């Protein structure tokens, strides 16, 4: 039985979240009655209201109204008054991933998983399939600039979704095609150990049907190890690795663009298809690899090299992924969501390759537990930045952990030989510090998953005002 159209109002608790809002928007577009609540208004709430959703600010039992189904994310606590009342009424309570899975059962699905790069890769797959005439439905974990939203309802048979591994619920998703970009230690608060993370990703791949396939990055050692463990399912590998089925070659990352070619090897015939002179307006080796994963899917679905080249040349990017927010005195300011050491290092490497000037990194560590568990990795991930400014940790509701803080990270970065790392005493000091450091041609990159994005958009104006 598939998701019936006769459902009464579907109530989302925390509807403004990036994952919840995308599912809610697709349900609205399918004709379902959607309502919800959130702790505060945001752009997602306003967008859903414009589409007809009734959304309350604050959580109260009477917000449920005539709801017949309640959708919650793992961020919602058991004592939430709406959740408690729903259970008192014996209403069905559905986890976010379960509702996503119900939508996926209506289509053939590509699900993109990995510790990093999911959102960009999801956007790239969506862009390619749209250009190929597949008219896909898309549910992403970030705002796709071309859509102005994180979801779209297509009339075609395919759906493209970001598979969030953070709470393990990605194992509920019925994917026909699975992409794994990488596997690194993350979300240890849920998984406990890295071994448990590896096991979860193996299950994710093994869950695909026999007629599906997995696309896996051979450049990443943990993913490469997993490739060797998968039996009885079709695997297509990609990367710079010379043994990859879909190989990234001839890479030029200068000038804020990615130029490369891709060689697709047919295992049965031994023949090769070369997709030459691909240009993508997005910098960084990590993004070229994300594009290669998307190309692997597009090629399998029969898209031509010209279709692939055209789609990637017009790729509009994803909000908060190396997003330019402004310029001051010839220095360019960027906003990026990177909040894990691997992500930060990749973004700074891309910045280094894109400018002849210097790279100034401003980081707001996200969660004390993450900084504590990956402290040595954080201390070593800023090598491509000429200067590092470290803000206070964005707690995301967590209690402080001794030593895992702003000053501790600054000291650790310096101890590993970095010549210019400094603390940010308060956000109001940021423009003054940047004015002292920045020169024409420099890239100023603000990094983090907290409210540092607001600083990134305010900084160009503050720099201009302080210069007046």
UniProtKB/Swiss-Prot annotation:
Its EC number is 6.3.2.8. This is UDP-N-acetylmuramate--L-alanine ligase. GO terms for cellular component: cytoplasm. One of its GO terms (biological process) is peptidoglycan biosynthetic process. One of its GO terms (molecular function) is UDP-N-acetylmuramate-L-alanine ligase activity. It holds the Pfam family Mur_ligase_M. SUPFAM superfamilies: MurCD N-terminal domain, MurD-like peptide ligases, catalytic domain, MurD-like peptide ligases, peptide-binding domain. InterPro entries: Mur-like_cat_sf, Mur_ligase_C, Mur_ligase_C_dom_sf, Mur_ligase_cen, Mur_ligase_N, MurCDEF_pg_biosynth, UDP-N-AcMur_Ala_ligase_MurC. It is found in: Cytoplasm. Pathway: Cell wall biogenesis; peptidoglycan biosynthesis. ATP binds at residues 114-120. Keywords: ATP-binding, Cell cycle, Cell division, Cell shape, Cell wall biogenesis/degradation, Cytoplasm, Ligase, Nucleotide-binding, Peptidoglycan synthesis. Belongs to the MurCDEF family. It catalyses: UDP-N-acetyl-alpha-D-muramate + L-alanine + ATP = UDP-N-acetyl-alpha-D-muramoyl-L-alanine + ADP + phosphate + H(+). Its main location: cytoplasm. Cell wall formation.
């Amino acid at each position: 039985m598939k998701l019936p159209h006769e459902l009464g109002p579907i109530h989302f608790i925390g509807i403004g979240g990036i994952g919840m809002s995308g599912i809610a928007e697709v349900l609205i577009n399918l004709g379902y009655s959607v309502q919800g609540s959130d702790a505060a208004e945001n752009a997602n709430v306003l967008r859903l209201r414009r589409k007809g959703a009734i959304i309350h600010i604050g959580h109260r039992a009477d917000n449920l109204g005539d709801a017949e189904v309640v959708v919650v994310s793992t961020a919602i606590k058991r004592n939430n008054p709406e959740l408690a009342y729903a259970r008192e009424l014996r209403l069905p309570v559905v986890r976010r991933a379960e509702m996503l899975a119900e939508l996926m059962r209506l289509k053939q699905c590509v699900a993109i998983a990995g510790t990093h790069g999911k959102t960009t890769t999801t956007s790239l797959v969506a862009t390619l399939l749209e250009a190929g005439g597949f008219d896909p439905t898309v549910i992403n974990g970030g705002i796709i600039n071309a859509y102005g939203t994180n979801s779209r309802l297509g009339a075609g048979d395919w759906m493209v979704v970001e598979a969030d591994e953070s709470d393990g619920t990605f194992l509920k998703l019925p994917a026909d095609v699975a992409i794994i970009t990488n596997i690194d230690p993350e979300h240890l608060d849920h998984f406990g150990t890295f071994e448990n993370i590896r096991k979860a990703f193996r299950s994710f791949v093994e869950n695909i049907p026999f007629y599906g396939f997995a696309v896996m990055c051979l450049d990443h050692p943990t993913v490469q190890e997993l490739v060797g463990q998968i039996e009885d399912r079709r695997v297509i590998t990609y990367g710079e690795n010379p043994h990859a089925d879909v190989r990234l070659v001839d890479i030029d990352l200068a000038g804020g663009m990615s130029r490369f070619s891709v060689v697709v090897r047919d295992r049965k015939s031994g023949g090769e298809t070369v997709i030459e002179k691909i240009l993508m307006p997005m910098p960084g080796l990590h993004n070229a690899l994300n594009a290669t994963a998307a190309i692997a899917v597009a090629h399998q679905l029969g898209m031509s090299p010209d279709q692939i080249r055209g789609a990637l040349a017009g790729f509009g990017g994803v909000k908060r992924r190396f997003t330019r927010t402004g310029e001051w005195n010839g220095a360019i300011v960027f906003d990026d969501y990177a909040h894990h050491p691997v992500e930060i290092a990749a973004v700074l490497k891309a910045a280094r390759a894109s400018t002849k000037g210097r790279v100034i990194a401003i980081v707001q560590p996200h969660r004390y537990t993450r900084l504590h568990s990956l402290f040595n990795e954080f201390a070593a991930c800023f090598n491509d930045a000429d200067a590092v400014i470290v803000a206070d940790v964005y707690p995301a509701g967590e209690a402080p952990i001794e030593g895992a803080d702003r000053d501790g990270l600054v000291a650790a970065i310096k101890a590993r030989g970095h010549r210019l790392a400094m603390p940010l005493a308060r956000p109001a000091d940021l423009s003054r510090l940047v004015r002292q450091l920045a020169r024409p041609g420099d890239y100023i990159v603000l990094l983090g998953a907290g409210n540092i994005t607001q600083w990134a958009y305010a900084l160009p104006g503050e720099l201009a005002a302080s210069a007046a």
